Amino acid sequence: MNVADLLHVLNELLYPELFNDYGPNGLQVGDAQAPVRKIAVAVTADLATIEKAIACESNVLLVHHGLFWKGMPYPITGMLYQRMQRLIENNIQLIAYHLPLDAHPEVGNNWKVAKDLGWERLESFGSTKPSLGVKGVFPEIGIHDFVSQLSSYYQAPVLAKALGGKESISSAALISGGAYKEISEAKSQEVDCFITGNFDEPAWSLAHELAINFLAFGHTATEKVGPKALTQYLKQVGCDSVVFLDTENPF
């Protein structure tokens, strides 16, 4: 298998052409004809992750957050230069899939959580098209027990909570990463709790004034789910050497 073959497998799974994304999906740095020897999968192509990929002798790094985003300046200097330099001098091909890995119903950052936790009557959720998140229902549970359940699942503490809603809940909506503004969409769809990664000052007032529960578990914690699932998928389809790199980032 070469990188072009791997890209075909990933594109057939994730359908990146359906998304108006914030950056390019697919090969960002490298040679499409390079052979795939070992794939490292991670959340973000930061320098710490790149160094881990080098240390484990990977020649492909597959991430959720790549190097390039809309509106970035063109010069390749500073932090971006350092990251690219380490990739190129170690012959590591960088592949990134952003929104497609959030939205996927099997290996995505959102649907995978809902299915693993046994939510039922699952539907797409979110104000974007295609929708990135998921909503569902479950047996009634106290909100504090629900927080504990999610903390155990994500292996991360809740970073922020605004409990403006019911003390016992039976429905939730989830969009991983930086989606706290979707709390209003969650209220409009009459769910009891909205879960995301990031939070900001308005979320507190919104949760209490809209009478909904809001939970934030960190951008990184909520977006490890998809890369981990993608690691297992690649093993199942015949990629012999694939590892998930868990770089520390509590945000």
Curated annotation (Swiss-Prot):
One of its GO terms (cellular component) is cytoplasm. A divalent metal cation 1 binds at residues 64, 102, 223. A divalent metal cation 2 binds at residues 65, 219, 223. InterPro entries: DUF34/NIF3, DUF34/NIF3_sf. Keywords: Metal-binding. One of its GO terms (molecular function) is metal ion binding. Homohexamer. NCBIfam families: YbgI_SA1388. This is GTP cyclohydrolase 1 type 2 homolog. It comes from Chlamydia muridarum (strain MoPn / Nigg).
